[in-house]
Design a protein with these regions (language model features):
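Acidic/aromatic-lined carbohydrate-recognition and catalytic surfaces
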Residues: 1-227
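Catalytic cores of eukaryotic secretory-pathway lumenal/extracellular enzymes that build
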Residues: 231-238
Length: 238
């Protein structure tokens, strides 16, 4: 059976905050598709972007992009105040995404949300972490290490960490426990918002056609989300 569809990535939705988000504009777009009789919404990979900011080159094939988390939703949940994100200059113009601005500010807002949330970690959050531990633990630690190393690629880190030495990873996990929890929290909020948006679309009769990152880069090698993955399993020049 033939169906009509439109390609519109989350990043291209209208937003005052530099990049499209899973908030009102996303739900409005679903309503537009319904009114136009469009049955399929095609999107690009939802994974966090890496150097170059292509949705097809990511830190993980499992994780979601923090940039798409809607601030207004976090505000309604009581996790942040409007002043936490409204007073930030998110873009240079209305037609292009400035990823440097977003990178430098998005995590500040999300840290404020986490600071509020961690006072009362919910059962739902704990269930999410346990259910996704097969990839989430490695991903969160990788991101914590990447931030600690000022965004440098893994091959410029301490050699033992880069080669996934078990003792070095154990020590890093203990030292960066709070930071890894922050990145787990980000994924929890992403998938909560994404699940709600997807359900809304599906309930309205709109199917979502997804995609996945296909370019394995050197920064993906130790953060693919597969237990035991290390640079000795993949070659970055093949």
């Amino acid at each position: 059976m033939r169906k009509s569809g439109i390609l519109m990535h989350i990043s291209s939705l209208p937003s005052k905050y530099g990049i499209g988000k899973m908030g009102k504009s996303a739900y409005d777009f679903v309503d537009f598709l319904v009114s136009a009789g469009v049955k399929c919404w095609q999107i690009l990979p939802l994974s966090p972007t890496s150097y170059g900011d292509s949705p097809y080159q990511s830190f993980s094939v499992y994780a979601g992009n923090p940039y798409f988390i809607d601030f207004e939703t976090l505000k309604r949940e009581g996790l942040i105040k409007k002043s936490d994100y409204e007073d930030i200059k998110w873009q240079d113009n209305d037609h292009q995404v400035n990823y440097s601005i977003i990178y430098n500010n998005c995590f500040k807002v999300l840290r404020q949300a986490y600071k509020t949330y961690k006072r009362d970690i919910s059962k739902r959050y704990k269930t999410f972490v346990e259910k996704n531990s097969s990839w989430l633990d490695d991903y969160a630690l990788f991101m914590a290490l990447k931030f600690k190393n000022n965004g440098k690629p893994w091959y410029e880190w301490d050699k033992k960490l880069a080669m996934r030495d078990s003792n070095a990873l154990k020590k890093a996990s203990e030292e960066l426990e709070k930071e890894t929890e922050f990145f787990k929290f980000i994924q929890y909020k992403f998938f909560r918002q994404w699940s709600n948006l997807k359900k809304y679309a599906n309930d309205k009769g709109v199917e979502i056609i997804g995609d996945m990152p296909i370019y394995v880069s050197s920064i993906l090698i130790v953060s693919s989300g597969i237990k035991g993955t290390g640079p000795y399993l993949l070659s970055s020049n093949q």
